[in-house]
Curated annotation (Swiss-Prot):
The active site is at 48 (proton acceptor), 130, 165 (nucleophile). Optimum temperature is 45 degrees Celsius. Belongs to the carbon-nitrogen hydrolase superfamily. Nitrilase family. Keywords: Hydrolase, Lyase. The keyword Lyase applies. It catalyses: formamide = hydrogen cyanide + H2O. Signal peptide: none annotated. This is Cyanide hydratase. One of its GO terms (molecular function) is cyanide hydratase activity. Oligomer of dimers, forming left-handed helical fibers.
Amino acid sequence: MAPVLKKYKAAAVNAEPGWFNLEESVRRTIHWIDEAGKAGCKFIAFPELWIPGYPYWMWKVNYQESLPLLKKYRENSLPSDSDEMRRIRNAARANKIYVSLGYSEVDLASLYTTQVMISPSGDILNHRRKIRATHVERLVFGDGTGDTTESVIQTDIGRVGHLNCWENMNPFMKAYAASLGEQVHVAAWPLYPGKETLKYPDPFTNVAEANADLVTPAYAIETGTYTLAPWQTITAEGIKLNTPPGKDLEDPHIYNGHGRIFGPDGQNLVPHPDKDFEGLLFVDIDLDECHLSKSLADFGGHYMRPDLIRLLVDTNRKDLVVREDRVNGGVEYTRTVDRVGLSTPLDIANTVDSEN
């Protein structure tokens, strides 16, 4: 499918989430979708784990301290087949806008770092999970499986993809996205402290500036994509909610001002937001600009040697229990997107919801 729109306006969210409060998180999500719609945007990108906010406390606590916070976080995470998700999908429909949404997904007893791509009709075009939680994130989140790996989809605003946090640094994830001809990318980031907090031996890669100004433009250059980097911000009240009892409170400003948007040649396209800025970063996208960069270096095409270097990708779901298919032979698999209820068209989901 060729894109219908080659030129359009897009937005990246640079704002504070509704910390560990599902209802407030949904309200803020719909608010920013509405604001992007009013501004004439065709696409809006949210940060990693926007709902219900990134659990930054996990970097500060020991096991015992984590348990009350972990319980609250789980209680305020978002089930995919829920009234809250349908409200967000309906907001996308009302504004006729594509939405890349990052959230903590409840699936049975586990949580996952999930992204969905919602269409202007409110249907789910892509459901993916971060393939590996980073370091202490494994205290909270499980890993994605084969059928939640895909990040790039064809839409009428181009081939659009999204990844979470350090997936944007992963050379294999970038190579896979490049092979699919990605044109517009969401590098979704959570909450990161600034470089002024860095203490050896913590590496520089673990501060905001490294990811905002090195990792993100590198993704744009290497894939030839418009790369939107939505980012979470935090206030003094948010710091309190993220700080376990007995821990020192930090200055919220060290976390803010890192939202970015880069062109397919790596140029910064928007001014760096002020530390106190909360809102949307806007960009005018022209898909033909991608061709200029890709004509020089298309690592998914003419500038690669698959006869020498190839990447093996397995997109099959790995189930804990596998059932034999006695009719067709082999085994039966249930797609994750079907099992969590996201493949149901919004019209049907709304009807079922109204009947219950």
